[in-house]
Amino acid sequence: MMQRKIKSYVLRAGRISNRQQQGLDLWLEDYELKFDSPTPWNFAKEFGRHDADTIVEIGFGMGTSLFAMAMNNPQCNYLGIEVHKAGVGSLVADLHEYQISNVRVVVHDAVEVLQTKIPENSLAGVQIFFPDPWHKKRHHKRRLIQSEFIQMLVKKIRPSGFIHCATDWEDYAEHILNVLSSESALFNQQKEGGYSPRPDSRPLTKFELRGERLGHGVWDLVFIKK
């Protein structure tokens, strides 16, 4: 089992809007999966339906992409993992407003969630969009995407399932590509290797659109479990 003691995130006290606080206070209980439940989650039970693919998004931020993907793919289950309360409140408020029923959230460290709550071979895919690049070299050990972490993810994903990462930090993109390419249980969706075009399934965020206008690059990587 992976034993990760170095956190890939820092919890800071940030401002929470009235709407985000409403989401946390009034509607989070409708969507939250509790980490302290005694056994791994049964997704058929938690989502109230059988035979639906379950996709995990790690670090969903303000929930923009997760919300759009859930709305566009009602046949899929989405589980979002996030530790920052403002983003959780924002997503939950949107889910409530639009009555989206195919999303669940867990407010906890993603590594611990994956270690203890996600059954093996239960996921259709995992998506990690714009993780903290920890760009200073002395902080690289804090990067979420490391070989040991990917080895754990592979166990949770079923055969033919995917890992989809996106980053706007080229050095981190190169690191992710090396890590994923080194995992023997995965193959690159790009037959010639390297990065993938942005899949239509990943929505463009306002942040990304602004970056494109400024000439910033974004690198997508999609690997499939053999």
From Swiss-Prot:
<feature type="binding site">
    <location>
        <position position="168"/>
    </location>
    <ligand>
        <name>substrate</name>
    </ligand>
</feature>
<feature type="binding site">
    <location>
        <position position="82"/>
    </location>
    <ligand>
        <name>S-adenosyl-L-methionine</name>
    </ligand>
</feature>
<keyword id="KW-0489">Methyltransferase</keyword>
<keyword id="KW-0819">tRNA processing</keyword>
<feature type="binding site">
    <location>
        <begin position="205"/>
        <end position="208"/>
    </location>
    <ligand>
        <name>substrate</name>
    </ligand>
</feature>
<feature type="binding site">
    <location>
        <position position="57"/>
    </location>
    <ligand>
        <name>S-adenosyl-L-methionine</name>
    </ligand>
</feature>
<dbReference type="GO" id="GO:0008176">
    <property type="term" value="F:tRNA (guanine(46)-N7)-methyltransferase activity"/>
</dbReference>
<protein>
    <recommendedName>
        <fullName>tRNA (guanine-N(7)-)-methyltransferase</fullName>
        <ecNumber>2.1.1.33</ecNumber>
    </recommendedName>
</protein>
<feature type="binding site">
    <location>
        <position position="109"/>
    </location>
    <ligand>
        <name>S-adenosyl-L-methionine</name>
    </ligand>
</feature>
<comment type="function">
    <text>Catalyzes the formation of N(7)-methylguanine at position 46 (m7G46) in tRNA.</text>
</comment>
<dbReference type="GO" id="GO:0043527">
    <property type="term" value="C:tRNA methyltransferase complex"/>
</dbReference>
<dbReference type="InterPro" id="IPR003358">
    <property type="entry name" value="tRNA_(Gua-N-7)_MeTrfase_Trmb"/>
</dbReference>
<feature type="binding site">
    <location>
        <position position="136"/>
    </location>
    <ligand>
        <name>substrate</name>
    </ligand>
</feature>
<keyword id="KW-0949">S-adenosyl-L-methionine</keyword>
<feature type="active site">
    <location>
        <position position="132"/>
    </location>
</feature>
<comment type="pathway">
    <text>tRNA modification; N(7)-methylguanine-tRNA biosynthesis.</text>
</comment>
<keyword id="KW-0808">Transferase</keyword>
<feature type="binding site">
    <location>
        <position position="132"/>
    </location>
    <ligand>
        <name>S-adenosyl-L-methionine</name>
    </ligand>
</feature>
<comment type="similarity">
    <text>Belongs to the class I-like SAM-binding methyltransferase superfamily. TrmB family.</text>
</comment>
<dbReference type="Pfam" id="PF02390">
    <property type="entry name" value="Methyltransf_4"/>
</dbReference>
<dbReference type="InterPro" id="IPR055361">
    <property type="entry name" value="tRNA_methyltr_TrmB_bact"/>
</dbReference>
<dbReference type="InterPro" id="IPR029063">
    <property type="entry name" value="SAM-dependent_MTases_sf"/>
</dbReference>
